[in-house]
């Protein structure tokens, strides 16, 4: 999550344009999605511990190299390397936890795992935003952030490598315990089920309307003439909202049902995006950012619940989640490129107007989809 923030400061420092950020983020999403497809083979070949070494090594190289960047495309190349590692990490971790967790406990384990990730992102992302806006001894803050993040990732890589050399890959491959080989890609026949198809379409529209809110908001704030130092305040507010949203919306599903929670969240998101575009005062933007974080990331567990509610075969979960994730990831390949050109040709405000409109349309597949089966 720190990449879009750092990239926005690099755009300003190098005199580049918003569309350059869109190209970089689109390429990163494309290669990250493709890298994620190779997670299973990577884990089987190298084992879980060595796979983590490769992932953290990609983080370290990507950030450390950008400490010395002199142009936006150099920065983009090495950020793509870091984000490819990010694309592999969650698939490898989820696979590892799924294989080694009882089905009845899987939801709790994965929920705790994602919550821990959010706890880490909140202070780290805010730290990156605050520090990147300053300079120290003539060194831009974003270079210092890249150096710190790169050093930490490289140290973790060396520790994991030392652990593997000393103990071997005690965790083994996260996929080695499966009895039958499975295809890397889920079958397209999943879309024959109307409920599955409507949920996947809703997921695509949800991703279009919400996944790039964080990435392009620095440009929106710049367009409003705000001090770059407020980016850190926004980052903190938005990530706190994301953490709260995952927990709050997940619990509301048990009370009101996943359909009602999703529809309400998307309509609220549309209204909040309209407020964000028109707001001028920092307090209003901060409050709106928190609420946007809640309804943006809160819809992710809601859609996952909606997707599997009518499914009785636990073996189908892997294919359903993989297809849903791939569909959303494919959307994220295109949206940064589209939004970057919109921001350059018109202004960042038009991006958020488009997001608000699509957020309303995301309700339709869920509203008119087949009623949930028992």
Map each language-model feature to its residues.
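Residue-level signature of mid-helix packing/kink "hotspots" within the transmembrane helices
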Residues: 1, 29-37, 122, 239-243, ...
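Intracellular juxtamembrane helix-capping segments at the cytosolic ends
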Residues: 88-101, 298-312
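Structural signature of the two symmetry-related core transmembrane helices
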Residues: 50-64, 260-274
